[in-house]
Amino acid sequence: MTDEPNPIIRTRALKPEDGLPFRHPLNPNSEAQFFRLSRPAGLQRAHVNMLRVPPGKEAFMLHRHSVQEEWSYIVEGEGTAQIGEDRIKVSAGDFIAFPLNGKAHTIVNTGTRDLVYLTGGEDTPYDIGHFPGIHKMAVFKPDGIELIDEGNARTYSFQQWFAGDLG
């Protein structure tokens, strides 16, 4: 008997109860079934998850990352990817890249059946998520998440910071 993870996850065999019900805490239109794939298969440095999103819903909300690159691959169904101000129809077979510090993005299920997609990216202990629609950012750390109102945030140059000129 081995304690090694099975490197093959048969996603077609997954049942709804194998996933985690997920709602983004800042988006009332968020609803998804969230299936972790990379950890059960033994990956530690990258994450890959499968999301099943019902019609009219989205898994996350308009956001971008400052530390982690992200991607999505549509497996079933159809939806609309919002990337910046652009709204683009997506369907099975489409790959979408979300580069570091790129445009804010989200994927909405605009179809009539569940939208199933893989999403993943880098797995770092820290990340910063920016939510432009609500003017907030989240700092993801190993011990929790800090939610910051961007209206209260101040930006300093390196010269100001190191000179202690924070007034």
Task: Enumerate the predicted regions with their spans.
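A short, N-terminal "cap"/entry segment at the start of jelly-roll beta-barrel domains
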Residues: 1-45, 130-167
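Conserved short histidine dyad/triad with adjacent acidic residue
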Residues: 30-34, 49-65, 100
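Short, conserved beta-strand element in jelly-roll/cupin
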Residues: 50-54, 64-82, 120-124
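Short hydrophobic/aromatic patches on the structural cores and recognition surfaces of FHA
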Residues: 77, 93, 107
